[in-house]
């Protein structure tokens, strides 16, 4: 049986980590560009937000519609919400989405994926390897 000392084991563990985990970068939540057009509220940079968060635009849309209790749809990279909502409220809901469905509850990093296991949604962290269940959006 091969014996390893602590330093050798630590070095082996660091070699197996993906590069993006080793670099220390700060996550900046995207700021929604919100405008009110008549009786609708439009998030103009919705496509960029979904790319930055690495989430399906449909999932983010479901979250906003459920939390705001409204109807809406995605149109050409914009999220159109029926009703007038203050930009601060939209920003707060996006922050809540990020905390619940993007950031790892264990290490706080945004390097996560939403994975469906059977009928349960799991937030899988690619940085620390943690798995945690998240609520299902209907």
From Swiss-Prot:
Alphabetized UniProt keyword annotations: Initiation factor, Protein biosynthesis
Domain of life from the UniProt record: Archaea
InterPro entries, per database record: IF2/IF5, TIF2_bsu_arc, Transl_init_fac_IF2/IF5_dom, Transl_init_fac_IF2/IF5_N, Transl_init_fac_IF2/IF5_Zn-bd
Molecular function via GO: translation initiation factor activity
Keyword Electron transport: no
Pfam families: eIF-5_eIF-2B
Biological role stated in the UniProt entry: eIF-2 functions in the early steps of protein synthesis by forming a ternary complex with GTP and initiator tRNA.
Subunit organization: Heterotrimer composed of an alpha, a beta and a gamma chain.
Family: Belongs to the eIF-2-beta/eIF-5 family.
Full protein name: Translation initiation factor 2 subunit beta
Species of provenance: Methanopyrus kandleri (strain AV19 / DSM 6324 / JCM 9639 / NBRC 100938)
Gene that this polypeptide is encoded by: eif2b
């Amino acid at each position: 049986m091969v014996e390893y000392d602590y330093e050798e084991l630590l070095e082996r563990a660091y070699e197996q980590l993906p590069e993006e985990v080793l670099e220390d970068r700060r996550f900046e939540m995207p700021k929604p560009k919100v405008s009110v057009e008549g009786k609708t509220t439009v998030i103009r940079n919705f496509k960029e937000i979904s790319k930055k968060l690495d989430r399906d635009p449909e999932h983010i849309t479901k979250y906003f519609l459920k939390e705001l209790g409204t109807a809406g749809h995605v149109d050409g990279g914009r999220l159109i919400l029926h009703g007038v909502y203050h930009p601060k409220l939209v920003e707060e809901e996006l922050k809540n989405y990020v905390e619940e469905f993007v950031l790892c509850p264990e290490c706080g990093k945004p390097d996560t994926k939403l994975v469906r296991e059977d009928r349960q949604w799991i937030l899988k962290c690619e940085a620390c390897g943690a798995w945690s269940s998240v609520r299902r959006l209907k």
